[in-house]
Amino acid sequence: MKKEHVSHCQFSAWYPLFRSLTIKSVILPLPQNVKDYLLDDGTLVVSGREDPPTCSQPDSGDEAEETQWSDDESTATLTAPEFPEFNTQVQEAINSLGGSVFPKLNWSAPRDAYWIAMNSSLKCKSLSDIFLLFKSSDFITHDFTQPFIHCNDDSPDPCIEYELVLRKWCELIPGAEFRCFVKENKLIGISQRDYTQYYDHISKQKEEICRCIQDFFKEHLQYKFLDEDFVFDIYRDSRGKVWLIDFNPFGEVTDSLLFTWEELTSENNLRGDVSEADALEQDSPAFRCTNSEVTVQPSPYLSYGLPKDFVDLSTGEDAHKLIDFLKLKRNQQEDD
């Protein structure tokens, strides 16, 4: 995998080419000060919200005591930076997409941070919602700090213009998502995306699903993407229509799901796990799904559910983070 392959999978690199096949989205340049804020792990305080003013005062008439209270309160308050111009741009984009969005950076979405949201969802209605997810996500940090870590060429790192991608929120059923692996412009493998769960309809319809994805690939993607080796994600709706969701590099930086990268990069045939009828077709990809509830596995995102911020809380190292987190949760409840 080369650095240019990673660059070609940035959202802004492929979206103009395949706009009609995917979910409506808006791309906004990410200001440097916003990037700096997102990478600052010193505080969990999130910008974009105002705390309500304090209405009560100590009942004691002792002025010195009141003054001391005020000083302590001031010292304990952490102030988040504000980005009024960027906030306006983001809110206008969110409104244009129906009021709710799925956010991501150039490559990754903060899927590992869903647990921190009020509704355990990546659905965002404001910049502060996005900031909370981004600042809690290792995937987002990876985009910023190590996008080319698995590349094997020695060329200089391409210059990356970071962008906030806002995708119109759609309620997608996990059992209808699939990841597809393309090698030398040939579709070689299809994997159930949410492999931690068993879906009866996938097992029953896998040959139909496989043909549907093959047709989509041949008509819309084959020989049209910027590279001959790549990974793409699709969603197949209840009517059988296939929607393009994302592109990923063909390499270890991308989760191979029910395959292994050793299998995908070797010269061996992957089609040993499909029906005999399909195996007779030269172009038939391997199709893998979770075949029974016995093989259900825990979610791969569970390991991301305990961030350093909360470890700090458990050891008493940073109580300010708990205060800021509770304030944010309170404001979210008031907005709802």
Swiss-Prot record:
Localization per Swiss-Prot or TrEMBL: Cytoplasm
Keywords: ATP-binding, Chaperone, Cytoplasm, Magnesium, Metal-binding, Nucleotide-binding, Phosphoprotein, Ubl conjugation
Tissue expr: Frequently detected in granular vesicles, in the cytoplasm of some epithelial, stromal and sperm cells and in varicosities lining nervous fibers, while it appears to be absent in endothelial and smooth muscle cells (at protein level). Widely expressed. Expressed at high level in testis.
GO molecular function terms attached to this record: ATP binding; magnesium ion binding; protein folding chaperone
Binding site for ATP: K104, W107, A109, R111, R167, K168, W169, C170, E177, R179, R193, D233, D246, N248
UniProt key word Aminoacyl-tRNA synthetase: no
Residues engaged in binding Mg(2+): D246, N248
Effect of A109V: In 3Y1tsD123 cell line; reversibly arrested in G1 phase of cell cycle at the restrictive temperature of 39.8 degrees Celsius; due to extensive degradation by the proteasome
GO cellular component: cytoplasm
GO biological process, one term: eukaryotic translation initiation factor 2 complex assembly
InterPro entries: CDC123
Post-translational modification: Phosphorylated.
Region feature (Disordered): 48-73
Modified residues (Phosphoserine): S60
Sequence ranges of Acidic residues compositional bias: 60-73
Function: ATP-dependent protein-folding chaperone for the eIF2 complex. Binds to the gamma subunit of the eIF2 complex which allows the subunit to assemble with the alpha and beta subunits.
Family listed: Belongs to the CDC123 family.
Subunit structure: Interacts with the eIF2 complex gamma subunit EIF2S3 (via C-terminus); the interaction is direct. Interacts with the eIF2 complex alpha subunit EIF2S1. Interacts with the eIF2 complex beta subunit EIF2S2.
Protein name per the record: Translation initiation factor eIF2 assembly protein
Native species: Rattus norvegicus (Rat)
Primary gene name: Cdc123
